[in-house]
Design a protein with these regions (language model features):
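Vicinal oxygen chelate
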Residues: 12-16, 62-63, 68-114
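Short glycine-enriched loop/turn motifs at secondary-structure junctions
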Residues: 1-4, 60-66
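Core segments of cupin and vicinal oxygen chelate
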Residues: 2-3, 9-51, 78, 85
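Short, charge-rich, low-complexity interaction segments located
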Residues: 50-58
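Short, flexible, glycine/charge-rich loop motifs used to bind or transfer phosphoryl groups or to couple energy/partner
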Residues: 42, 58-60
Length: 114
């Protein structure tokens, strides 16, 4: 039996700003649906089988409360250059990854502010 993580829900304070941020990083917008009291946006990073969703009425969690979500890349320097080229503020290095995860991630982790 295959078990696959499909979606992670991120609480955000400004749906349009969050959508612009992820679009600016080159993430694919899979959905942007709304009704009278709700809106859901789903975006997926290039090459990822897992997406994130955010919106209005999607979760009761506080904006910014999600912790411990990681994107892993094969080449951190190339990924950083691509993100900076798209206007992202990449905080590098992110030493907590090296202390906490050590060998498992090595030089494949960075923090992106947005």
């Amino acid at each position: 039996m295959d078990l696959q993580l499909e979606v992670v829900v991120l609480p955000v304070s400004d749906v349009d700003r969050a959508k612009r941020f992820y679009e600016s990083l080159g993430w694919r917008v899979d959905a942007d649906f709304s009704g009278p009291d709700w809106r859901v946006v789903q975006v997926t990073p290039p090459g990822s089988p897992c997406s994130i969703q955010f919106g209005t009425g999607v979760t009761s969690a506080a904006p910014g409360s999600v912790q411990g979500t990681f994107l892993v890349v094969d080449d951190i320097q190339a990924a950083r250059a691509a993100l900076v080229g798209r206007g992202a503020d990449v905080i590098h290095p992110f030493p907590a990854f090296n202390r906490v995860l050590g060998e498992s991630l090595g030089e494949r982790a960075a923090q992106v502010a947005g």
